[in-house]
C-alpha cells in the first residue's frame, strides 16, 4: 500500500515538472470574496500589458489555517494568496513570503491607491525585521462591533460594550465565535482609561496576552455568559433578522449583510462600534515563497488595486476595499442615504465631511479608538476561550490538527488539477465567509 502511494505521489511530481507555469497563475482566496468576472478580464488585461498569455487557476478556502498549512507544510505553489492580518504576520515570521516588487514597465502602479490609513496600519505588522508593506498589499478591511435591533435596544445603550451585561437581554445576545477578534476588542475597551491617560497605547496593547490581561477579558466575558444564546460562526445574521436575537458581537461585513437583509423586509438593524474602543481587521494579497509565476502575481495584485475593480469587488462581496481616492469616494457617497461624517483618515483631508455608509467607513473619531489584531499566543487565547464557552480545550487542539492534515490531503488531490473552482455568487451582498475563525 505504501509503495502504491509513493508511486502515485512520484507520478504527480513528474506531471508537475512538465507544467509550463509561466502561463498559469494560481490564486487562492476566501470564498465569495471577489467579482469573479474580473478573473477572466485580468487574463485579457495581462496580455495587453505584457504581451504574454496567462490562465488563472482559482481556488478558495474558508479557514486561514487550511491555507497556511498547505503552504507551510505542503509547500503548495500558489502564486497569490489572501490571508488575514495576523496570518500575514505569522508568514513573515516563518519566512514564507516573497518581497513585492512594484515595477510594472509602462503599466501604472495602482498599488499606490491603497489608503494611507491602511498603509499605516500595515506598518504595524512585522516579523523579524520584515514589514508587511514590503511583502503584502491590503485587499479588504473592517471592524468589530455590535449589530443591534433598535426596537429593543436604544442607540445610546448600544454605544457601550456594557450593553452585553444588561440582564434584561438574557438569551438575546449572540457572540461571534472568533476568539482573537473578541479578545482584542474587549482588551482595548477594558483599557480605555489607561489609553486615555497614556499608560497604554493602541499599537502595543493588542500584543498583550499576559495572564493579567487574559484574566481581565475572561472575567468580563463570564460576567454576561449566562445571557449568551449562542456562539455563532455564521447564523447570527439570520437570527437577528428573525428577531430571535437582539444584539450580536460581530464583524462589520456581517453587520452590513444583516442590515441589507433586514431592510428588504422592513426591519431596522444597526451597527455600533462602542465608545470604549474596538479593533480593525484586514485581509491582504501576498506572494508565497513557493510561487512559480511571480510576475503574473505582481500584476494581478496591481490589477486588483485599480479603483474601478475595487468598487466592483465591494459591490459583489459587501465588504470594504482598502482603495481610497476620489473615484471610490464618489462611487460610495450618497447624501440622501447617509449623514456626513469625517472620513479624511481614509479618503484624504478634503473628505472631512462626506456622506458615506458609517458601517463601512466609520467616523475618524471612532477609528482612532481602534487597535488591530496580531499573531499573539494562540494557545493561551484558545484555552481562555474554551473555558468561557465550556469547551474541552483539547478539542480545539484536535480541530487544528485535523485542519492541518485535511489541508495536506486536499493539497495532494488538487495540486495538479487545473479546473477553475469558481463559485457563483447568488446575491450582491452575500457574505464571503460562512466561517471566519482567526486561529
Give each language-model segment a name:
Residues 19-94, 393-397:
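Early extracytoplasmic/lumenal segment of secretory-pathway proteins
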Residues 108-110, 215-222, 265-289:
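Periplasmic-binding protein-like
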Residues 15-16:
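C-terminal motif of bacterial Sec signal peptides marking the signal peptidase cleavage site
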Residues 288-364:
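Mature extracytoplasmic/periplasmic domains
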Residues 352-439:
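Conserved C-terminal helix/tail region of periplasmic/extracytoplasmic solute-binding proteins
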Residues 59, 65-68, 85, 89-141, ...:
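Hinge/lid segment of periplasmic solute-binding proteins
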Residues 91-100, 130-133, 258-273, 336-340:
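Ligand-binding "clamshell"
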Residues 175, 182-186, 194-270:
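Ligand-binding pocket segment of bilobal, Venus flytrap-like solute-binding proteins
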